[in-house]
């Protein structure tokens, strides 16, 4: 589990009480210039982080990540520009905080009691458990007593603290080491590639990386769930800290924090090794035949999202046919195809073009009150279920005091469309809402796999090209079949 167990009401209440308690220590009340004043005068909020799919990443210069989005919203709340400062390891993060080179750390950091003499933590925004991982196919250890190999964790991480405690209290024979050169993500990748026996990771990051490296397997949970939090410098100046607590309270109250958690963690729960392995194989062997068509017809939709929709529909089989008569890569009904001008549903280009147009029409048809970054999930539910049934799910949500514009609220009501207790009172009647729920969740998981897998391939290709270029410089060819040194 990666979902936080503390209620958002509790987080908001604690944040409010802390803000009130800190009120006397805010420097501007005594005529002094505090940290918040300095940030506003500078016009920048400096946030140190670590690159990771969950925390902060960039694809084609477009930043994303749970911590990035949360930090961006905090900077907007303060009315300043966000400046992201990436670091390679956790020790560097805290050094930057000590040296006043950053204003806060937003890097998916687990609460670590050993850090409290140097820094203080903000409210938790989700929770994770620490897990020991190994490569699938090698013997699975059931406890630290079963380890037969090397355990390496990232230097400065909470995993170091955990292993120290376990060695002192329960496993005196436990041997492990820390790496300054490798990040936690890189160590997890090394385990998946068979280059390292074991490491520790947090459950959320592991769940995401398994979509790209399905050989990465969880041996056992090392800890119960622990809060993930931002870190601030220990100081008598509480101005920035108090502003952060006010910001968190607003995020909790308006549901923004819950929606961010849903966006990045709501779909990572279940993992199917065979399904993931099959999909990654299809990326290499089948997708190249159709990628240019997805790119050509995607329009305002990310072509990779359009591609994973097609995979969910047909596994990229242009001849696919269901018992209900839907056909082709995008599995269009005859009526839908006719309305889109698709004459041959099993023609790959016609099917992709038709599916893209249909999805964009659904996006435009949605109520304007639905947030921009959540509209696609509502549109996909309508694509699978029918637009009217999706509206029924929104009405059910509103009737139960949920937010009909929030995907995290509406998706939980989709299965109710097939329950006798609810569907007789809906406008459009019975629908297989549980299938629509799984449909959207599967697409989100496939999207994580496709985006991450392609990024890994690009990174490896760039590394290979750099090595080739370096070899070319050190051994230049000066004649046919000759090189310097021959």
Swiss-Prot record:
The keyword Lyase applies. Keywords: Cell outer membrane, Cell wall biogenesis/degradation, Lyase, Membrane, Signal. It is a peripheral membrane protein. Its main location: membrane. It catalyses: Exolytic cleavage of the (1->4)-beta-glycosidic linkage between N-acetylmuramic acid (MurNAc) and N-acetylglucosamine (GlcNAc) residues in peptidoglycan, from either the reducing or the non-reducing ends of the peptidoglycan chains, with concomitant formation of a 1,6-anhydrobond in the MurNAc residue. Residues 22-268 are annotated as: Non-LT domain. The active site is at residue 313. In the N-terminal section; belongs to the bacterial solute-binding protein 3 family. In the C-terminal section; belongs to the transglycosylase Slt family. This is Membrane-bound lytic murein transglycosylase F. It comes from Yersinia pestis. The lineage of its organism: Bacteria, Pseudomonadati, Pseudomonadota, Gammaproteobacteria, Enterobacterales. The gene is mltF.
